[in-house]
Amino acid sequence: MATTQVELVTPTGTLFSGQAEMVVCRTGGGDIAFLADHMPYIGTLEAYPLRIVHPQGAAGDELRFEVGGGFVEVSNNRVIVLCDSAEPA
């Protein structure tokens, strides 16, 4: 499966930077999943678990982070998550 570059950033630093098959989060409009080559998107994040699904065959299936709200931007096969706070779930 194709991958997309993912950046998970908080005011204290970058918690994740790497390739993923999918990113799942809750926005102001509901739950959404971003795959490779997703159309451009900008939205607000709700406080909710964020899932980063690793490429097939990578160690571990997915990462989960409890995010405390923020923003998500998708463009040029890249997902950038800017959040107030995030901790591994």
Give the role of each language-model region:
Residues M1-T3:
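Short, charged, intrinsically disordered terminal tails
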Residues Q5-A89:
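Compact, glycine-rich, soluble single-domain proteins
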